[in-house]
Amino acid sequence: MIDRYSLLRPWLFCIDPEKAHNLTLSNLDRAQRWGFLERLITKPINDPQVLCGIEFSNPVGLAAGLDKDGKYIDALAALGFGFLEIGTVTPRPQPGNPKPRMFRLPEAQAIINRMGFNNDGVEACVARVRCSKFWQNGGVLGMNIGKNASTPIEEASRDYILAMEAVYEIATYITINISSPNTQNLRALQGEEMLRELLGSLGEARKHLCDRHGVRKPLFLKIAPNLDQGDINLIADLLLEFGIDAVIATNTTISRDAVKGMEFGEEAGGLSGAPVRNASNIVIKALKARLGNQLPIIGVGGIMSGVDAREKIMAGASLVQLYSGLIYRGPDLVYKCATVLRQP
């Protein structure tokens, strides 16, 4: 598949990034529905990993953001991922930020986006999840939740609780996204006072949902790379205090040091891809040093090869997730990463 993708990529890179993104996913979905995709993709790697009571078929997952609305679940599952994370979804539909809002920086193997949680709303996404064969067959599917842009930051807990209630029945795990730079003030939720309030509220809501549904769903927290040691230690301690089950490190960065002077390098938004790799690894190592084996870490950020995926595991992650690497390396990156991670 990678050879085919290397032929397609120059053509895709001539198209507006967001249009290319949607076109690629639509064609993947069409190929999957017609039965062609499985013939083009290398057989998935079976390398079971158990984390938070969940069995992942292999340790390579899809990061949130690629399929925000659950429209392409079965097509993406066919690429060989061990798990998928859908979203970010919000309680109410919202259009996101004005276009253009996605930019490629090929020289740095990077993407800048300021999408702004554009999505059809959590209820529409849940309906699509229920229709997917992947979910019906018991595939591991995380739901990434956020707050609406119109909701004041002081009332953020309300939105997260509404979204959690909506996805609870269909999610294998639920990720609390407080680290996107594209929703005003969202990252303020990583501060001690607001994070305590949010995690406490979600913990209470989960207890009620557990009683109602008879099952305790794991809660993961996704954090930013732009954190100092004190911030990381504080967040790690709060995760343990409030019974959060895992941490995803990291989201996109607001730093532009690695892309200075490049076309689009000064665009507002979150920078992902190769430039965030080291920053993500540093956060993972710091979390591991603080948490030890008390809480698992999922590593994401800048994985462009199997070696990069291995670095995340060596830094302290138990699983990894891909996004920008798929844009630059193509679907075969899933197989390559899973193959390297299966090796002793």
From Swiss-Prot:
Binds 1 FMN per subunit. It is a peripheral membrane protein. The active site is at S180 (nucleophile). Pathway: Pyrimidine metabolism; UMP biosynthesis via de novo pathway; orotate from (S)-dihydroorotate (quinone route): step 1/1. It is an enzyme of class 1 (oxidoreductase). It catalyses: (S)-dihydroorotate + a quinone = orotate + a quinol. InterPro entries: Aldolase_TIM, DHO_dehydrogenase, Dihydroorotate_DH_1_2, Dihydroorotate_DH_2, Dihydroorotate_DH_cat, Dihydroorotate_DH_CS. One of its GO terms (molecular function) is dihydroorotate dehydrogenase (quinone) activity. Substrate binds at K68, N113, R114, M115, G116, F117, N177, N182, N251, T252. Signal peptide: none annotated. It is found in: Cell membrane. Keywords: Cell membrane, Flavoprotein, FMN, Membrane, Oxidoreductase, Pyrimidine biosynthesis. GO terms for biological process: 'de novo' pyrimidine nucleobase biosynthetic process; 'de novo' UMP biosynthetic process. Monomer. HAMAP family: DHO_dh_type2. Catalyzes the conversion of dihydroorotate to orotate with quinone as electron acceptor. This is Dihydroorotate dehydrogenase (quinone).
